Amino acid sequence: MDWGGLHTILGGVNKHSTSIGKIWLTVLFIFRIMILVVAAKEVWGDEQADFVCNTLQPGCKNVCYDHYFPISHIRLWALQLIFVSTPALLVAMHVAYYRHEKKRKFIRGEIKTEFKDIEEIKKQKVRIEGSLWWTYTGSIFFRVIFEAAFMYVFYVMYDGFAMQRLVKCNAWPCPNTVDCFVSRPTEKTVFTVFMIAVSGICILLNVTELCYLLIRFCSGKSKKPV
């Protein structure tokens, strides 16, 4: 996956975000994507190869691994980051459309602006108001939903956030209940708890930003003359 391309796109959104939104993007890339790319892949790189069961029955080890780890932590984290980042891309599309319309009207002479050329329009910071306010606020709301949903999926799918050292499996074609051992359970538990904690921090930042936008919206409404 091209995380650099995603950073470039979201970096464009970052120019029009609130201060809280800028902090969220920093946390997203430094504490989640960088950890996922640099460290987590090393920890989970050997997960299936080093998943050992005390049986020689063909297929038993693979079935047991699939039963306890239906989706790799790495892939689920990557999927989570995609879902969490997608709403921000909607904001980028909205800003791009806004600038396109403004450039079109500028070229046709339909609007009078303080800008001398199109390049200045491209560099303009778009204020979070009007229809963009709804797009931006909606993107934050869906980020919170996706973060919470994936945290719940993690907890249910893996029966908690701690990685077990020993799991017992009696799925077919295992001849009986076999013991299977997970490699690096403590290290994987630490990484899992860290990623979940960062998800919680991101939810807190998103809720704080959402409250800030709602308060600013309501205060703006109250200042308008009746």
Curated annotation (Swiss-Prot):
PROSITE patterns: CONNEXINS_1, CONNEXINS_2. The keyword Nucleus does not apply. GO terms for cellular component: connexin complex; plasma membrane. GO terms for molecular function: calcium ion binding; gap junction channel activity; gap junction channel activity involved in cell communication by electrical coupling; identical protein binding. InterPro entries: Connexin, Connexin26, Connexin_CCC, Connexin_CS, Connexin_N, Connexin_N_sf. Residues 1-20, 99-131, 216-226 are cytoplasmic. It comes from the Eukaryota. The chain crosses the membrane at residues 21-40, 76-98, 132-154, 193-215. Residues 41-75, 155-192 are extracellular. It holds the Pfam family Connexin. Keywords: Cell junction, Cell membrane, Disulfide bond, Gap junction, Hearing, Membrane, Transmembrane, Transmembrane helix. The keyword Transmembrane helix applies. SMART domains: CNX, Connexin_CCC. It is a multi-pass membrane protein. GO terms for biological process: cell-cell signaling; gap junction assembly; gap junction-mediated intercellular transport; sensory perception of sound. Disulfide bonds join 53-180, 60-174, 64-169. A connexon is composed of a hexamer of connexins. Interacts with CNST. This is Gap junction beta-2 protein. It comes from Bos taurus.
